[in-house]
């Protein structure tokens, strides 16, 4: 039961972070491109890579807080469904270049951030 509460608490934190970051990015850069979704996906992927590498290398044992971070916070912070919706909406609006750019940036940057996070931990081991 405690694990479920950790996941729920983490989900609330991650969802609030996602909303706040998305609103901040819209305020700073405008709503003509889904910068908020891109930022949360890239940052969340980087943190996920670090967390995974720490656990894989035995620096963080299967801790009860792992579900809070990896499933709760990062699961709610990053969101494939928002990425997919943003991309479809851009395409429906005829902004095909932005839709393709959104797909390319999310895929390449998120994969790179997971790898970077893992390598950052591996270089310190």
UniProtKB/Swiss-Prot annotation:
Coiled-coil regions listed: none
Membrane topology summary: Multi-pass membrane protein
Keyword annotations: Cell inner membrane, Cell membrane, Ion channel, Ion transport, Membrane, Metal-binding, Sodium, Transmembrane, Transmembrane helix, Transport
GO biological process: cellular detoxification of fluoride
One GO cellular component term: plasma membrane
Pfam family, one: CRCB
Reactions that this protein is recorded to catalyse: fluoride(in) = fluoride(out)
Chief localisation class: membrane
Cellular localisation: Cell inner membrane
InterPro entries (UniProt xref): FluC
Residue numbers binding Na(+): 75, 78
Activity control: Na(+) is not transported, but it plays an essential structural role and its presence is essential for fluoride channel function.
Transmembrane segments: 4-24, 35-55, 69-89, 103-123
Family: Belongs to the fluoride channel Fluc/FEX (TC 1.A.43) family.
Job of this protein: Fluoride-specific ion channel. Important for reducing fluoride concentration in the cell, thus reducing its toxicity.
Protein name according to UniProt: Fluoride-specific ion channel FluC
Protein's organism: Aeromonas salmonicida (strain A449)
